[in-house]
Amino acid sequence: MKVHMHTKFCLICLLTFIFHHCNHCHEEHDHGPEALHRQHRGMTELEPSKFSKQAAENEKKYYIEKLFERYGENGRLSFFGLEKLLTNLGLGERKVVEINHEDLGHDHVSHLDILAVQEGKHFHSHNHQHSHNHLNSENQTVTSVSTKRNHKCDPEKETVEVSVKSDDKHMHDHNHRLRHHHRLHHHLDHNNTHHFHNDSITPSERGEPSNEPSTETNKTQEQSDVKLPKGKRKKKGRKSNENSEVITPGFPPNHDQGEQYEHNRVHKPDRVHNPGHSHVHLPERNGHDPGRGHQDLDPDNEGELRHTRKREAPHVKNNAIISLRKDLNEDDHHHECLNVTQLLKYYGHGANSPISTDLFTYLCPALLYQIDSRLCIEHFDKLLVEDINKDKNLVPEDEANIGASAWICGIISITVISLLSLLGVILVPIINQGCFKFLLTFLVALAVGTMSGDALLHLLPHSQGGHDHSHQHAHGHGHSHGHESNKFLEEYDAVLKGLVALGGIYLLFIIEHCIRMFKHYKQQRGKQKWFMKQNTEESTIGRKLSDHKLNNTPDSDWLQLKPLAGTDDSVVSEDRLNETELTDLEGQQESPPKNYLCIEEEKIIDHSHSDGLHTIHEHDLHAAAHNHHGENKTVLRKHNHQWHHKHSHHSHGPCHSGSDLKETGIANIAWMVIMGDGIHNFSDGLAIGAAFSAGLTGGISTSIAVFCHELPHELGDFAVLLKAGMTVKQAIVYNLLSAMMAYIGMLIGTAVGQYANNITLWIFAVTAGMFLYVALVDMLPEMLHGDGDNEEHGFCPVGQFILQNLGLLFGFAIMLVIALYEDKIVFDIQF
């Protein structure tokens, strides 16, 4: 008898050793003091429940102290510390996952890793397997562990038969319970991809004994029941009942169910996981989003799933129904992504007050619920599907409201932009003539820069679909700094090519302007030499005239000359004399080329000629005094006017003045600008109408872009019209008439956008062509050839060149900023 008892005792010891060895084999990836600490906690759980509460308090205190050391100061957690903690947990704000991550999994840690890659916090490498690729490393760990288990635990398989039976309700692996306890405490610290899924509020969590074992199955291990004799099975069943009485750490034995519900707000479904299979989202019983829960639909696991549902007690189902009704009556903030301020507010705590350890223990269930429910993570594909479904599910009344809002917003936008044409009225009375010339030169260049920049940087890329931001990568890893730069080049490829085209236009403008400046200064030096020579000759002629004997002849001698001429008409004699003198002077002054004479030269010639005629004019006055004839003065003035008129039209090239345009009426350039401005406003209306028909956000963004380039464009057009010879009133009237074309374009664009969406891109292309024509054909030649009259107001070519360059570069910069950052302009206006 003694031998038999001894043999039985040895067999029990052997089985205990094998179970312990297999447990160590499965948990082999835990090393260091922390693993020993968890093993010590697991051994503590085997002791009676009176010691479990103390161990749970110690563990809670240990981890809270660690968190407070990392995020707090002096035993208190500040608002910013808690905000940093929530950020590291992926909470506090809703984030959209845009990267395709089917190979990385859909658990919370994988989402955090993808968001970190997406935000540029760290990068994955293609060449080797990164430590953040949690799913692959985890699968390799599971494979290696299972292999070691198969090799080291074969004696157990030889002596003990392993089977899985769905009708066995009381068989529960103690090691699974132990690992369940480890994973509960180390979920936030453990670097894996498995998210801990707690069951619904069970009797064991309330400290009550339960005959129903836990149905949770880990993804990285297999659930197996050991087939033992009936007596051993009963003992093992009793042991399972004792283990079920162990209190889960963090919940005291006398914790009431209602109190737990009040603090935690946690209602989790039954979740069953099978290793090696992907998760399929199924609806939860607590009324949350269907994409929250994970359920495996593997055919081999259907029996286990039916077994789980079969073992559910009636009171558990009733509790689930009650909790569902409570959830429906709860506030919506429990199903939202809460930031720090909202979280503290719902707990009745101010944002400026420090957070104690006791309060933090109350916050932990809410944080775990936010993590488990994935309330702060959204998929980009899901958002697109929701938008499409929302558009499909629109009621006819909603569609009518959206159409009406597009028309109303388009009309308001066009009205505001059209009022920019009245800004010229404010500028004209305030600015004097000199400053206004500077402003006109700058605004003309600014209009050219904004229109050509808008065409090449904004409209053409849009017409080619260059702003499609649905950039999805087939791999959720492998990012580097070089890849980021390549992504930028690919995303803004059309914009950068348009910028290069603008650079070519600007380069040719600089070259042509420099050539014109060189020729101008060369001509100026030649003119100065000729004027110096001419002044010397004129001074000699004036000295000869002053020394002429006629100057010393008395008046009686002048009176005696009339009979010698054969007539008594003094006027005719004087005309002949003047014609002789003027003919000589004209013969001397015909040497310089007529095409290079400007207004300053005419003034100099006029002044020198008046000096030569001064003596003759004095003698005419003396003759008129003696003969009482007043006709001499009139004839002389008429003749001098005819001479000046003959020399005032020597130049019709770059030195023409604005008075020539006024004498001939409104120039062709003015009418072309008016027509171009009207077509421009029509195209603006088309673009704004098409954008508002697609959505309010895009319409407002397009309106801002049009406003930014329309402001300098309208002022530039106003300046060109004034330079062409129009009055201020005429320029305002024509600007308002051209602005009316924008309303017609907006009506057509809105109608086309609502009923023919594919034509919108073609509208952008046509608008770009119109912008380029107006800027490069009408306004750029005005910059190059229309500023010759500025010399009479003290303008120099270098100053004009600087102002024009500033206007062009500033216009290019405005359009480049809009093209690069237009996607950041987001408005959500609802009517």
From Swiss-Prot:
It is a multi-pass membrane protein. Residues 172-188, 229-238 have a biased composition (Basic residues). Residues 126-318, 464-484 are annotated as: Disordered. InterPro entries: ZIP, ZIP_Transporter. It catalyses: Zn(2+)(in) = Zn(2+)(out). It comes from the Eukaryota. It is found in: Cell membrane; Apical cell membrane. Residues 152-171, 189-198, 256-273, 281-315 have a biased composition (Basic and acidic residues). Zinc-influx transporter. When associated with SLC39A6, the heterodimer formed by SLC39A10 and SLC39A6 mediates cellular zinc uptake to trigger cells to undergo epithelial-to-mesenchymal transition (EMT). SLC39A10-SLC39A6 heterodimers play also an essentiel role in initiating mitosis by importing zinc into cells to initiate a pathway resulting in the onset of mitosis. Plays an important for both mature B-cell maintenance and humoral immune responses. When associated with SLC39A10, the heterodimer controls NCAM1 phosphorylation and integration into focal adhesion complexes during EMT. Belongs to the ZIP transporter (TC 2.A.5) family. This is Zinc transporter ZIP10. It comes from Homo sapiens. The gene is SLC39A10.
